[in-house]
Swiss-Prot record:
Pfam families from the UniProt entry: DEC1
GO process annotations (BP): negative regulation of cell population proliferation
Protein name per the record: Deleted in esophageal cancer 1
Organism superkingdom: Eukaryota
Organism the protein comes from: Homo sapiens
Transmembrane helix recorded as keyword: no
Tissues expressing the protein: Expressed in many tissues, with highest expression in prostate and testis. Reduced expression in esophageal carcinomas.
The entry's keywords: Tumor suppressor
Function: Candidate tumor suppressor.
Keyword Transferase: no
Amino acid sequence: MTMNVLEAGKWKSIVPAPGEGLLAVLHMMVFTDALHRERSVKWQAGVCYNGGKDFAVSLARPKAAEGIAD
């Protein structure tokens, strides 16, 4: 499974690390739930590099992500 994430203003396709597929499923469930309820729930996906080829995919609401980045 691949995910498209926005990093440094550019979209990248990544392959989640084992176990990270659950986050993708959670993201799709939240998006689908928002469509069914006719409201918008925005989430921001980010990649956290641990050095080398290791990384993790994280999901956060944009306001929370801004607080972390500051």
